[in-house]
Structure formats: structure tokens, C-alpha cells
A protein has these predicted regions:
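Short, charged/polar N-terminal "headpieces" of proteins
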Residues: 1-19
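Catalytic phosphate/metal-binding cores of nucleic-acid and nucleotide-processing enzymes, i.e., regions
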Residues: 13-40
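Generic low-complexity segments that are intrinsically disordered, proline-rich and/or Lys/Arg-biased
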Residues: 25, 53-56, 95
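Acidic, aromatic-enriched beta-alpha/helix-loop junctions
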Residues: 30-78
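Short, compact, well-ordered microdomains
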Residues: 63-108
Length: 108
């Protein structure tokens, strides 16, 4: 497994799937000397029938809880590209096509 630099800290991904819709659930893990802290960078957006509104090879980036500098850095590193935006409630989420081959190199 490889690591990438995020704000001066060694970081990697955890990849899983959301139970409803089976879309990628992407978590960034940040290494430190005690414990690896992590946070999800994706959100599972569903329509009224609980069907995913994001394409299978994409995520809705969680701009409510993840800073713009993280979004910019991960995009700069080529882990995804923004292909659209989607509205949910009061928020517009970037829809990002994942470079899963590259992400898996940096994932456990």
C-alpha cells in the first residue's frame, strides 16, 4: 500500500460500499503516532424511492464536513475529477468520477 500527503500527514483510503444503493463509501485515514483518524469524504444521496442519484463510478463529495483544501488536494493528486453537481437540501455537492485504480493503490 502507498500513502499520500494530506496537510503534511501520511494518509490513505478505506473503501467500502453504502448498504443502500451500493455506491462507493470513501474514507480518508490520516496516520499519526497514536491512532489513525478517519473521516468520510463521500455522502450517499438517494431519491424519494431510496435509489442512488449518483452514478456507480462516482461519489458525492461531502462539502458539508470536509474542507475545500482536502477536496482540492485529492483532486490535484488525481484520485477523482468533478463531472457534475447535485443538489440535496440546501447543499450542492460535487459529483466526482473516481479513479478507482489509483485509489486502490492507496487503500487497505
Amino acid at each position: 500500500m502507498k500513502y499520500f500527503d494530506l496537510d503534511g500527514k501520511k494518509s490513505y483510503f478505506n473503501i467500502s460500499k453504502y448498504v443502500i444503493g451500493w455506491r462507493p463509501a470513501l474514507m480518508v485515514r490520516v496516520c499519526d503516532n497514536v491512532v489513525d483518524d478517519g473521516y468520510f469524504i463521500s455522502v450517499n444521496l438517494l431519491d424519494n424511492a431510496e435509489k442512488p442519484i449518483i452514478p456507480e463510478d462516482c461519489i458525492a463529495f461531502d462539502v458539508n464536513n470536509v474542507g475545500p483544501e482536502v477536496y482540492a488536494r485529492l483532486r490535484q493528486l488525481g484520485f477523482f475529477e468533478e463531472v457534475d453537481t447535485v443538489n440535496s437540501g440546501f447543499c450542492f455537492y460535487p459529483v466526482c468520477k473516481l479513479n478507482l485504480k489509483k485509489i486502490k493503490e492507496y487503500a487497505v
